[in-house]
């Protein structure tokens, strides 16, 4: 088994296009690393799938500056009609606004149709909220939703 030694200095994030050098002058850190964020909806307290509802299911504060790359999702039970989700970004001086110009949706299938990103950047301190915004059919909106917001930092 390989063991890698990691130090604080070797994790310094350097953009070489600026002419900066690493602390020890030899190592540079990787940039644009994956920073995927998972959200769930439509589960009870025992993680048994249940119908999704129109509400906010998760919120977090971003701790790094980065970019939104895309979104993927899956429902254990597909909806009848279109169940639409949204991710809103807010922060100092920014009201909660969607990061999508076309919101992602489950269109009578288990897999999420990705939507179109209109906001692609976030900063440390920005808040994001994951919501189910529209149910195509209240009696069969889908259940057991898992969504991953793909980001890079």
What positions do the PLM features span?
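Terminal beta-strand-rich extracellular "head" domains
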Residues: 73-126
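Beta-sheet-rich sandwich/jelly-roll-like modules and their strand-loop junctions
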Residues: 27-85, 137-153
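Short, intrinsically disordered N-terminal pre-domain segments
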Residues: 1-19, 152-153
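Short linear motifs centered on Gly/Pro in flexible linkers and helix caps
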Residues: 11, 20, 32, 40-41, ...
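Short beta-strand-plus-loop segments that form exposed binding edges in beta-rich domains
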Residues: 130-138
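Glycine-centered small-residue hotspots that permit tight backbone geometry or close packing
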Residues: 18-20, 43, 66, 124-130
């Amino acid at each position: 088994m390989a063991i890698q030694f990691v130090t604080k200095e070797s994790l310094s994030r350097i953009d070489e296009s600026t002419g900066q050098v690493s602390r020890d002058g030899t190592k540079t850190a990787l940039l644009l690393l994956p920073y995927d964020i998972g959200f769930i909806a439509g589960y009870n307290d025992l993680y048994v799938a249940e119908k999704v509802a129109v509400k906010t299911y998760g919120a977090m504060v971003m701790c790094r500056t980065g970019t939104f790359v895309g979104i993927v999702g899956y429902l254990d039970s597909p909806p009848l009609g279109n169940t639409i989700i949204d991710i809103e970004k807010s922060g100092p001086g920014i009201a909660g606004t969607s990061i999508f110009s076309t919101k992602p949706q489950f269109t009578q299938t288990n897999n999420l149709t990705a939507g179109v990103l209109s906001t692609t950047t976030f900063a440390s301190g920005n808040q994001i909220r994951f919501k189910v915004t529209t149910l195509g059919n209240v009696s069969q909106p889908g259940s057991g939703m898992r969504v991953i917001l793909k980001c890079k930092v």
